[in-house]
Structures are given as structure tokens and as C-alpha cells.
Amino acid sequence: MKKIYFMILMLVLISTNQAFGHKLISHDDSHRNFESALVIPDHKISWAIYDNLGVNEAKFYTFEAKKGDSFYASIVIPKIQGLENYAPTLVMVGEDNFFRDKVIYENGFPGKEFYEPFGQVTYWERQELRTEIPKDGTYFIVVTDEKNQSGKYSLAVGEIEDFSGENMFTLLPKAWLDTKFFVNDYVSIVIAFGIFLAMCSVPVIAIFKKRKTKL
């Protein structure tokens, strides 16, 4: 029985690792200016940041880069009722404002859909930013509202999938849970918690029955 549980767990970890390409960056929602910008450890690695904006708000992210580096960032919107026309602005700014690249979404709404199998979530695609870093330095990504809208978005940075050194037994469950909270899918959380309790109860019941038969 233990071997079966282990094999099932390994298959789940392998399949979810293949489906989930981004490493999540958690935060406390305090990155609201350049001084408190959320640090992106390595802009080449594929990261995802779940975030939200109020009307006329902005969120700030920062990273270090070298001249000639390729940089990628994009925004997607979770397919939630009320966000069909939501499209915040994406701005890349160099330290001391020596470099600035502003990208707005200019296609139709609600936008092209894509399904993310790990979190079982559908997103609407928005704008992408691809550029070459002009010189060594500190850079900022600013996601801001310019349309008097509020909503949720996922900011993706980098394109290299790298989970080396990560504990997948803790990383994947946390990432799944964060995704469900992000899209307000509390039903899936309750179901998963119920399944977890049921699985934990199986060995307990087996031990209880074994002791009972001995008596």
C-alpha cells in the first residue's frame, strides 16, 4: 500500500512539474513605489507573480540586468467574471529613468484564452514586452491602472524554466493553493482538503482495525 501511494505521488509531482513552468514569487502587497519594489531574483528565470490593482494604483518590481541581456515580461488576466475588459499598463523603467518602454494592450476583448493545466485555470492574454537591456543596472517593471479599473493580473517574467534546488513536495502544493486563492476557487480548496483528510484517515483506520482484530 505504501509503495502504491508513493508511486501515485511521484506521478503527480512529475506531471505537475511539466505543466507548471513558472516559479511563484510571494509578496505582502507592499510594493507600491520604487523604494519598496518587489525583487525579482533573476530576470532570466521564469517567474509568475499574482497581484491585484485598485483604481489608479501601481505595483512595482525590480531586477538587476547586464547589457545585452534579453528581457521578457507579460501580463495575463484570470478568466473571472468582471475582468473581461481589464487591461493594466506595463511599463519598464531604467534606474534614474534612463530607459523607458511602455506597453499597452491594443487587441480585442476579452482576448485570446489559454489554459494552465497545473492550476486548472483559464487566462486571457494581454500584452508582452521583449527587449534588449541597453546597459548594466537596476531596472523596474511597473504595472499601473490608466483606465480607472481595478482587477487581478499575473505578471510573468523570464522564459527559462528552472526548478533546481527546490523542494517539489512543498513548492507544488503551495503554488497550487496560491493559484486557487488568486482566482477565488475556494470550492477546489475545500475538495482537496477533504481528499487529503480522507487519505490521511486510511492508515489510521487500518491500524485501528488491526489492533481491534488482535483484541
What are the residue ranges of the model-derived segments?
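Bacterial N-terminal signal peptides
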Residues: 7-15
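Sec/Tat signal peptide C-region and signal peptidase I cleavage site
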Residues: 16-21
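A surface-exposed loop-and-adjacent beta-strand signature within N-terminal beta-sandwich domains
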Residues: 29-36, 50-51, 97-115
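Extended, solvent-exposed segments with strong compositional bias
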Residues: 105-132
